[in-house]
Amino acid sequence: MAAAAAGPVAAASRLFRSFSDALIEQDPQAALEELTKALEQKPDDAPYYCQRAYCHILLGNYSDAVADAKKSLELNPNSSTALLRKGICEYHEKNYAAALETFTEGQKLNSADADLTAWIKRCQEAQNGSQPEVSASQRTHQSKIKYDWYQTESQVIITLMIKNVQKNDVNVEFSEKELSALVKLPSGDDYSLKLRLLHPIIPEQSTFKVLSTKIEIKMKKPEAVRWEKLEGQGDVPNPKPFIADVKNLYPSSSHYTRNWDKLVGEIKEEEKNEKLEGDAALNKLFQQIYSDGSDEVKRAMNKSFMESGGTVLSTNWSDVGKRKVEINPPDDMEWKKY
């Protein structure tokens, strides 16, 4: 049943309508498509362009991301977030001088943004061709942090068991035969992982996701073959076709067999019991409703929010699918078109 978005629901609906980072990270491709539709209706919306740039970054489409970030800055020159995203793309395209200039401009607008400071440092190090020294504590972290991996017919999935990491503190780069990950740990130390992969992957279809309990890296296989190990020089003459393991017991970096189903269950239980407050709790609730819903539920939610300007939330497709959803703001608010 359609209902006016009031109180917590109104807050949640605003989070959805603004395409928050957390929602985009759930499914960057779906968010990209929705933002493209939204921009058809509101072609001068700077935040929409900025968030679509984030979608492109997560999908590895850096040239498209730069274009959207620039458009966002044309509409709102004072957006430090748009400058951050433009700079990240320039950095990944190895245009370090331009990236440094962009990050510096963003820092002038928001000197308290730690992400801009960190990226400025990375650019300076890249320009100088220097690598930061590895401290003793950093080497200790490197030895303690473990990763596991498993595979499906279409993907190889690596999970870094690192908790409470901010998404902007994680940088993952894919190439056809290599994976490189750099993580700024909560302690302030860096963790790096570099792998020479056994078989090729499709970099542009490989992604990563930062969760509160782990970092999940998904590498797209070009063909459905079984990886006998994660690293190597491609010295397997005749790769075997992929056949799923019955018990889901997969190889890991620590060279012993792990019951992945049990591990995933433990992580999901920990995520489920995580205590969130305020907007974070509302955001998680809204993500859960959307991710667990059927295709009809998702269509109903998208249609009702877009047509009502974010004032109505409905999961009933049989109702909203056959009519235009009218604007219906909460009793204590007045709708204004800008």
Swiss-Prot record:
Subcellular localization(s) per the UniProt record: Cytoplasm; Nucleus
Domain CS: 142-231
Protein species of origin: Bos taurus
Entry remark concerning the domains of this protein: The CS domain mediates interaction with HSP90.
Every SGS domain range: 249-338
Keyword presence, Phosphoprotein: yes
Subunit composition and interactions: Probably associates with SCF (SKP1-CUL1-F-box protein) complex through interaction with SKP1. Interacts with S100A6. Interacts with HSP90.
Phosphoserine found at: S254, S304
Function: May play a role in ubiquitination and subsequent proteasomal degradation of target proteins.
Top-level lineage group: Eukaryota
Position of the Glycyl lysine isopeptide (Lys-Gly) (interchain with G-Cter in SUMO1) cross-link: K268
Family annotation (CDD domains): p23_CS_hSgt1_like (cd06489)
S-S pairs: none
Family (UniProt): Belongs to the SGT1 family.
Family annotation (Gene3D superfamilies): 2.60.40.790, Tetratricopeptide repeat domain
Crosslink position(s): Glycyl lysine isopeptide (Lys-Gly) (interchain with G-Cter in SUMO2): K268
GO MF annotations in UniProt: protein-folding chaperone binding
One Pfam family per UniProt: TPR_1
UniProt keywords, alphabetically: Acetylation, Cytoplasm, Isopeptide bond, Nucleus, Phosphoprotein, Repeat, TPR repeat, Ubl conjugation, Ubl conjugation pathway
Biological processes, Gene Ontology terms: kinetochore assembly
Repeat positions for TPR: 11-45, 46-79, 80-113
GO cellular component: cytoplasm; nucleus
Residues carrying N-acetylalanine: A2
Protein name: Protein SGT1 homolog
PTM section of the record: Phosphorylated at Ser-254 and Ser-304, dephosphorylation promotes nuclear translocation, most likely due to disruption of the SUGT1-HSP90 complex.
Keyword Repeat applies: yes
PTM sites of type Phosphothreonine: T257
